[in-house]
A protein has these predicted regions:
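Negatively charged
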Residues: 1-143
Length: 143
């Protein structure tokens, strides 16, 4: 929908409401490689995520400077956050997480890969149920 977009202007998606979606890959790649995106939706309110729900959602949005404040999910399925912010080289902070159970594999794989401007890590990673490799490479390439 908003992927692979570039323009001389900027895109502020802070007012965009993304409701619960029960399908696989619901919001996957929604803004992928959108270089106009500077402000993400303020909140991602879904509490139960389906497989690959937010995978690659902001992948390579190199001008993103304001990510979501909160990811409200408490239960997530396979690869829900895989490469979600990967390549967002101007993103200064992470969202706050409310995750209690990571019920699939590779949930946060390379989630913030190469986010070289990260200085504020807001996620406390409160999950009490973990699966194999759930946080694998989450902050790879961050300096």
């Amino acid at each position: 929908m908003f992927s692979n977009t570039s323009s001389s202007g900027t895109l502020d998606a802070s007012g965009l409401h993304l409701p619960y979606c029960s399908g696989v890959y619901c919001y996957g790649n929604l803004f992928r490689t959108n270089t106009a995106l500077t402000i993400a939706p303020k909140e991602l309110p879904a509490t139960t995520l389906t497989k690959q729900c937010y995978q690659g959602m902001f992948y390579n949005c190199t001008n993103l400077v304001t990510g979501p404040e909160v990811i409200a999910a408490t239960t997530v399925d396979d690869q829900s956050f895989r490469i979600m912010f990967s390549g967002c080289s101007n993103l200064p902070s992470t969202p706050r997480f409310e995750i209690k159970a990571l019920e699939g594999e590779d949930n946060c794989y390379n989630m913030f890969y190469n986010c070289t401007s990260l200085t504020d890590i807001n996620c406390t990673l409160p999950a009490t149920t973990l699966t194999e490799m759930c946080y694998r490479g989450m902050f790879n390439g961050c300096t």
